[in-house]
Amino acid sequence: MEDQFIDIGIDNARQLGGYTGADGRKVRQNVLIRTAGINDISDETAEKLASEYNVKYVVDFRMGYERDAAPDKEIPGAANEWISVYEPDMTDPVLVDMMNKMAEAGDDSFQKSIEYAKTGRLKDLYTEILFSESGQKGYAKFFDILLDNRDGAVLWHCTYGKDRTGVAAALILYALGVDEDVIMQDFLLTNEVYKNNIAYLEKELISRGCDEMVIGETQAMAGVKGEYLTAALDAVKEKYGSIQVYIKNQLGVSDEETEQLRNMYLE
């Protein structure tokens, strides 16, 4: 899967081209692009995305405060769509306590990671997104953008290009008929990108005397855990019957639109 990585000066930048989808057709090269944040990319990278990759839509899955703190760099000729797919319930006392402790941690990013891990919410993040109103409305809009795109590439991102972005990639690959094992392999490529970060965070957490539960969440904090996505997809299947039914009924992508997507993004 080395062909998925693209060297454009953005962390975790990959394209979904080459995977086998419905009827044995392949996902088109360089038209479905997933990345980490693009707020600090160079002018050269922005121009390359416009001229070489023909990016026509940028989809930003971050929350409002993330976008305000680090606005996207403008890509010439591309529409920028903000779709927050995760809006945590800040009336939840567990999350309120976490936010207070993270605020107390100040600039200590490691302590913030520890406080996040202690909530035990990491394992349920993808399930929360897929079942939430903001997640379903957001990914429905994402599919609308994919359907509206006629002559270029769509780039989507969050902060690190792993969770909200990874779920979006999984959904479009499902819609295109890509095998679930391949979808999971693509999802896990994030760990190759962030392997040094994962190792460094684990070492730091051990040095701080963190318990096994917190240390065990290292990969989910700095990378991704496949079992967490599997659990979310299994929950969707249990409630709705299949991922395709979820895409049709919860995200509003009709059978005709699914076929349209396949004609647009497979070859």
PLM-predicted stretches and their roles:
Residues T159-Y160, R164-T165:
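Ser/Thr-glycine-rich phosphate-binding loops at phosphate-binding pockets of nucleotides
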Residues M1-L155, A168-E267:
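Cys-dependent protein tyrosine phosphatase-like superfamily
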